[in-house]
Amino acid sequence: MTTAPSGLPGTPLPPARRRERPRWPLLVAGAAVLGLIGYMVLGNANSNLVYYVLPSEYQQDTAKFAGKTLRMGGLAKDVVYNRDTLALKFNMTDGQVAYPVQYQGAVPDMFRNDAVVVMEGQMQQGVFHGKSLLVKHSEEYKAADSKGEGQYSQDDLKKILNDQSTKP
């Protein structure tokens, strides 16, 4: 049995007091962790950005995109695909400028001549070497002209390429 300091038997001890810790170190540590996470997310965002351009926009400022991975979007023209080797070659155009494209891999079912495509890759010696291929489509039907080719203006292309609601 414990006794009080006065020595009287049966007198309970007063409840132990906890030493109250200041809360500001915890708040400072939490703010530092949040700041570090924010810096890591936003600081690395620029290095992970992939630029999206049309062929004519690329031609206007080739030095800006030199050596960088970018997304180029436009119409696929003069498509040549070898199913045995999975080698794809075509010209990507926005109606003003065309660049030859090379891609190695499976091609989506919707890919065809005059399809609106987005390629991610790099330009090397005037040829765009794609790493990934995306076929975009408009939600609106656009009839082919008398030559059997789709008619897209540069504004139509931008609208289709920037439309995030369409599935690749």
Curated annotation (Swiss-Prot):
Gene Ontology terms: biological process: cytochrome complex assembly
GO molecular function: heme binding; metal ion binding
Residue numbers on the Cytoplasmic membrane side: 1-23
Residues where heme binds: H137, Y141
Bilayer topology: Single-pass type II membrane protein
Signal peptide, first to last residue: none
Annotated segments matching region Disordered: 145-168
Parts of the chain that traverse the membrane: 24-44
Keyword annotations: Cell membrane, Cytochrome c-type biogenesis, Heme, Iron, Membrane, Metal-binding, Signal-anchor, Transmembrane, Transmembrane helix
Record has Nuclease as a keyword: no
Alphabetized InterPro entries for the sequence: CcmE, CcmE-like_sf, NA-bd_OB-fold
Primary location: membrane
Localization per Swiss-Prot or TrEMBL: Cell membrane
A Pfam family hit: CcmE
Residues in the Extracellular compartment per record: 45-168
Family: Belongs to the CcmE/CycJ family.
Function: Heme chaperone required for the biogenesis of c-type cytochromes. Transiently binds heme delivered by CcmC and transfers the heme to apo-cytochromes in a process facilitated by CcmF and CcmH.
NCBIfam families recorded: PRK13254.1-1 (NF009727)
Protein name per UniProt: Cytochrome c-type biogenesis protein CcmE
